[in-house]
Structures are given as C-alpha cells and as structure tokens.
Amino acid sequence: MSFELLATDGKARRGRITFPRGTVETPAFMPVGTYGTVKGMLPRDIEAIGAEMILGNTFHLWLRPGTEVIKKHNGLHDFMQWKGPILTDSGGFQVFSLGAMRKIKEEGVTFASPVDGSKVFMGPEESMQVQRDLGSDVVMIFDECTPYPAEHDVARTSMELSLRWAQRSKNAHADNTAALFGIVQGGMYQDLRMRSLEGLENIGFDGLAIGGLSVGEPKHEMIKVLDYLPDQMPADKPRYLMGVGKPEDLVEGVRRGVDMFDCVMPTRNARNGHLFVDTGVIKIRNAFHRHDESPLDPTCDCYTCTNFSRAYLHHLDKCGEMLSSMLNTIHNLRHYQRLMAGLREAIQQGKLAAFVDAFYAKRGLPVPPLD
C-alpha cells in the first residue's frame, strides 16, 4: 500500500491510496459489508455507485461462515466476488458491543458467541490470523474500544492495554503483505489520546485510525477530539475515522484532516426508509409521498433516482417489498459517494470553504466553527 497526498485546503486533504487491487481516492467513504455483503447490493451495484473500497467484519465472518470456508475460496474477495480493496476491522468493537457477555484479560477476550452461545476466545494473534485468512488489503489491529463515559483511570488502563495489544498485533502480522493500521484510543482525554498516538507511532504502522468515537458521546465531544487529533497524526499516512457517520460528520471530519470513513448509517437508514438528500433526510414512508411522481432527488444520478418516482418508493416501502431496501440503499450509498467526490474536488480546487457553506445552507444550518 502507498499513500500520496495530492492537495490540501486548510487541514483538509485530497489523496490517493494505491493497493495491488486498485486505487482509492480520498477522502473516501467505505460501505460496510458485515457478513461479506453490503446489504441489498450486488458487487456490480457497489461498483456502480462509485465505491472503491469496502469494509468486512472480522468478528462476524470468523463466527459465520468461518475462515475454513472462506479460505477454500482463496479469501474474502473471491468468496463475495468483490475485485477492489477490502478493509477488515479487527473484531474489537464487536467484542466491546457484547457488554456483560465478555471478559477482558491481558491475553484477550473470552465471550459467549452471539451465534450459538459457545465460549469463544479472541486475542491479537487470533484476530491477525483471521484477517490473514480473509486476505484483506487493510488489516486493523486488535484493540479495546474504550467505553463512554469512562473515568480517566479507566480510559488510561484501556488505552494502555490497547497499546500492548497493538504491539502483539504487529508481531503477529509479521510477513503479511497487507497494510496494517493502528487505532488511537484514550476516550475523551487529550493526554491519553496523545500517549496512544505516540505509542502507535513508535511501533510503526502503515496508517492510523481514530477509534472510540460514535460510542454514545455527545457530538461536541467527538468534535473536540477531531479538533486536535487528526492534525497530530503523520501527514504521510492515511487517517481513518472508524464508524462515523452522518453526512455532516463526514464533512466535519474532512475539514479536520480525516481521509477515510465507514458507517452502517446509509445502508441501515435505507432499510428504514430514511433517504439522504442535499436538504437533509426524506422519510419515504410518510403518506404525503403516495402521489408524488417526482424523483427522490432530481440532482442524483443513481439508478433509483433516474428511474423511479417517490410514489413508487413509498409503495414498495409500505408493502415491505425486498426491492424497497435495494433501491433505497443504492440511493443512500450513491449520495455518500457524491458527497465525497464533491469534497475531493473542492479540496483540489482550494474551494472547500465555499463547498461547506453551500452544504450547510441547503440544510438550513449554520456552519460549525473550526477550532
């Protein structure tokens, strides 16, 4: 993997990540394919909406169908028939999400499988082996996602454990030719975040991610971290904000120097009939769309908007048709890709401020200040 910085506008960066399987223009949004599929999307649909890289979930694929099945297909790419780069998360966040079902020790985490209730163990070495078996292009270290809220001592202990696991992840990654990303933890505490970053830089990674955000903290707490952290991360490596978020969050992350994003929001919201447009969100389930012959978004070039009316999308949603989720997902993911393309072009032209002004004006919102 190589990263090239092509342009900057303030803290915002326009770059390109090159993998043997293809290039990813940044800032980039990666659709989430938890079980080896982006829900409701064929691989050709994912390509058609402009996504260049997707995310796979190590934890869930390890439990189901199991790496022994995926290895027979020579890895996740052939298994799911996606030709572009894949980033796999380490499973740390999913283990964190299990709450009382898990027990964390120095060696790793023991938990009850959400599939069949059996006792399962995962540590850094296991996570690295699973990701090696999946054949992902970007491997994430195994870490503990610091909960919110957390007292300073709790956040410090969690961060220090994650650093030790980061070193073990690096050791276990060994001769794997895939890129390995570290994850900055430390909760909402700047001193802990900076210690985490320093420790990860000393270990040495191909890219760095910001973890432990969008875990229940207020928006202003997340922004506070983004105000200082990305700018302190190495300029010659990709910066990845994990699990975030809304279109506004992507814009604010880009303004502060983030290069990569992922989130289930566009796909999950699509299945609930919440569709993103430049002015905000359209709830296609609402009755007043029943007779609306206009496209969902006349400015959008996706298959959904160029072929179907709001009335048809409303009808499919009310009937619970499978096609409803599929068409909604195509639109939402294309909306996110168009947003990222607009941000890239604005940075390239040195016109990000004007782009951001227009973005918030369409939503009737003030532009948030930059620290």
UniProtKB/Swiss-Prot annotation:
Sites where the protein binds substrate: 89-93, 143, 185, 212
Binding, Zn(2+): 300, 302, 305, 331
Active site: 89 (proton acceptor), 262 (nucleophile)
Keywords tagged on the record: Glycosyltransferase, Metal-binding, Queuosine biosynthesis, Transferase, tRNA processing, Zinc
Pfam families reported for this sequence: TGT
Region (RNA binding): 243-249, 267-271
Subunit details: Homodimer. Within each dimer, one monomer is responsible for RNA recognition and catalysis, while the other monomer binds to the replacement base PreQ1.
Protein name: Queuine tRNA-ribosyltransferase
Protein source organism: Pseudomonas putida (strain ATCC 47054 / DSM 6125 / CFBP 8728 / NCIMB 11950 / KT2440)
Taxonomic lineage from the root: Bacteria, Pseudomonadati, Pseudomonadota, Gammaproteobacteria, Pseudomonadales
